[in-house]
A protein has these predicted regions:
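Conserved AMP-binding A3 loop
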Residues: 54-56, 179-206
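Gly/Ser/Thr-rich phosphate-binding loop
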Residues: 267-272, 282-340, 352
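Conserved ATP-binding/catalytic segment of the ANL
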Residues: 363-368, 372-421
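Conserved pre-ATP/AMP-binding loop-to-beta segment of ANL
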Residues: 41, 165-183, 190, 213-220
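Flexible, low-complexity linker/hinge segments
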Residues: 18-27, 155-178
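Conserved AMP-binding/adenylate-forming core of the ANL superfamily
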Residues: 21-25, 42-73, 80-86, 90-94, ...
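Structural core segment of the AMP-binding/adenylate-forming
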Residues: 1, 68-75, 98-161
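Conserved AMP-binding/adenylation subdomain of ANL enzymes
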Residues: 202-220, 228-269, 284
Length: 421
């Protein structure tokens, strides 16, 4: 099987301590963003179809929209982002944060009723929507008694923001400032809010980089996950900026289109995700993927056939991982290729994994025995918004069933159907 020469060279640089993999320490997401804008203003930041923004333009658009947001929402107020994957979504996220607001992310495909359930948990002071879903979001906004702004065509256009060129907002933001609320359905299907301050969110961003280290100003990312999902928020918004990188934005996953974009833009980091995404690309027409070197995967079980076919096609392994909105990335396959089929890799630094008996006794199980997966670590929450603690002694029950191998790899095999958290 032909191995990727690109990947081999990059891993060599990583093993030799090349500073291109090093990141500056930040206590908040806003400082991270503006540092990137100042460090590489002429660098390509966002590409969507035939539209693109440099980091200087990205910053100008963010500053312009932040000024509008500040007229409606005070610092530490809450802004719901309900925009499909787009340049507008990325601008909206950083604009709200730069205005000092806490953001919540909502799936742009949701109905008014589904959005209403999220807004009951975390009532917004302002809702930002895209053109495609402005009517649905508008109905939800009326029900929540919150103002709505459409970002993009039919509302505040990016081009309009670029013309205003306002100064960067002067808002004091610290690691303790509220940052983001993401929603998870858990095993009950009822949404729950996962709330993080800036310091906690930066710990998730850094964990993503630990699992999948990338090169400063050398990568081109392509994300297919919804930006409202924890995977999409990081792979399609936060981590490309953390690496001063270009991001190719895909509104919807279409295998033929994505394969062509990966070739055209020389994509080096593909956010991937579930097995179905990789299977779709395997069925797409041949494309030149020689610039590609990093392919994370997760959210579903990968068959041996899918893993083998992808590696045969690209010379690259799919780096399976296990993560949750409640803790970010938790385990990941080693970059060096020492994978164990059927597992999601080893616990990342700062994360502990335990397996508990399914009888409710709390008894910890040895290797190779199925039980409920428990997680503990600095970025793992202990409670959901407005609900009592669910973690005991720091251990959060995941609702997933799995086992650990004797050398510490985690395998996820099922979902605990009757668990209420």
């Amino acid at each position: 099987m032909q191995k990727s020469k690109t990947r081999s060279e990059i891993l060599r640089r990583l093993s030799e301590g090349d500073p291109v993999f090093t990141r500056k320490e930040y206590s908040d997401v806003v400082t991270m963003f503006w540092d990137t804008v100042e460090a590489c203003p002429d660098q390509l930041a966002l590409v969507e179809g035939d539209r693109s923004l440099s980091y200087a333009q990205f910053g100008a658009a963010v500053a312009g929209l932040a000024a509008r947001i500040s007229q409606i929402v005070p610092p530490s107020g809450r802004v719901a982002i309900c925009i499909p994957n787009s340049i507008e979504a990325n601008v909206a996220i950083y604009a709200a944060l730069s205005a000092g607001a806490e953001i919540s992310t909502a799936n742009a495909e949701y109905t008014p009723r589904e959005l209403g359930a999220l807004f009951e948990i975390a009532p917004p002071g302002l809702i930002l929507a895209g053109k495609r879903n402005s009517n649905v979001a508008g109905e939800a906004a009326d029900n929540a008694h919150a103002p709505l702004i459409t970002v993009g065509e039919g509302g505040i256009a990016i081009e309009q923001l670029l013309d205003t060129q306002p100064a960067r907002p002067e808002v004091k933001i610290t690691g303790d400032s509220p940052c983001i609320i993401m929603f998870t359905g858990g095993s009950t299907g009822a949404p729950k809010g996962v709330q993080r301050n800036h310091r906690s969110e930066m710990s998730v961003i850094k964990a993503m980089h630990t699992a999948w280290p990338t090169r400063v100003q050398e990568e081109v990312w392509l994300n297919v996950a919804p930006i409202s999902h924890v995977w999409g928020t990081h792979m399609g918004c936060f981590n490309p900026v953390y690496g001063h990188s270009a991001l190719i934005i895909v509104p919807r996953f279409q295998p033929d289109l994505v394969a062509g974009m990966m070739e055209k833009h020389r994509v080096s980091v593909f956010s991937g995700g579930p097995a179905a995404i990789y299977q779709g690309l395997l069925a797409a027409p041949e494309a030149d993927l020689s610039a590609l070197w990093l392919c994370p995967g997760g959210g579903s079980v990968f068959s041996r056939q899918t893993l083998s076919r992808w590696e045969a096609k690209t010379g690259l392994p799919i780096l399976e991982a296990f993560g949750m909105t409640e803790g970010g990335p938790l385990t990941a396959q080693p970059l060096d290729g020492t994978h164990q089929y059927g597992t999601t890799g080893l616990p990342l630094p700062g994360i502990e994994v335990a397996i508990a008996a399914l009888d409710g006794s709390g008894k910890r199980l040895p290797a190779n025995e199925n039980g409920e997966i428990l997680i503990r670590g600095e970025r793992v929450i202990d409670r959901y918004m407005g609900l009592p603690p669910v973690a005991e002694d720091g251990w959060l029950p995941t609702g997933d069933i799995g086992f650990t191998t004797p050398d510490g790899f985690l395998a996820v095999v099922d979902r605990k159907k009757d668990m209420l958290i």
